[in-house]
Amino acid sequence: MRIGILGGTFDPIHYGHIRPAMEVKASLKLDKILLMPNHIPPHKNTTHSTTEQRLEMVAQVCTSLPGFELCDIEAKRDSPSYTVVTLKQLSRLYPDDELFFIMGMDSFIQLQSWHKWQQLFEFANLVVCQRPGWHLAAESRMQHELSARHASIDALSISSHPQHGHIFTVDISPQNISSTQIRSQLAMGEIPRDTLLPVTLNYIQKQRLYFS
């Protein structure tokens, strides 16, 4: 089984998270996507909703979307959400499956600042989402890593057993949506129907989340 993993604060989860994940799932023919809210993001100091509320929003999204599942192992951890620790744990939970950790190009460029980043490749493949026609600058620190580990999507159909350590790039449609933007709209009394799944908007309104 090929399993995609998309982590994030998801405060709240929105189409800017979901649509790229769906495109990656289709492009790489993944069997499912794990949506994984983190508990204590290493690069963020606070959230605007509780861990329980974010878990519930993601759980409801997964109920609405076939092939999506909630993964709560980071949310239940009382320590920073270091990706290498999470992937090691997931590789033990799914020993016979192939893991694909999904990230944006902006995160990939900063990958060398991540905790034990080189060990990520011991447990999973990386999927780097990029806008069509966009390429990593030749002088980028991560260009060598990308060149050395880059694999074509066609190679997936050739492999008969799980692999890790590769980097796949997937062109995705631009998504000019952010959680900050959505929270600001809600605080001003605007209803961002075009950016949230109906089930998420309904939950936010019932819980009075993000309203000032």
UniProtKB/Swiss-Prot annotation:
Highest taxon listed in the record's lineage = Bacteria
Q: Kindly indicate whether the keyword Magnesium belongs to this entry.
A: no
Provide the E.C. number(s) assigned to this enzyme: 2.7.7.18
Report the catalytic activity: nicotinate beta-D-ribonucleotide + ATP + H(+) = deamido-NAD(+) + diphosphate
Database matches in SUPFAM superfamilies: Nucleotidylyl transferase
Pathway(s) the chain acts in: Cofactor biosynthesis; NAD(+) biosynthesis; deamido-NAD(+) from nicotinate D-ribonucleotide: step 1/1
Full protein name: Probable nicotinate-nucleotide adenylyltransferase
Query: What is the scientific name of the source organism?
Result: Shewanella oneidensis (strain ATCC 700550 / JCM 31522 / CIP 106686 / LMG 19005 / NCIMB 14063 / MR-1)
Query: Which gene is the coding source of this polypeptide chain?
Result: nadD
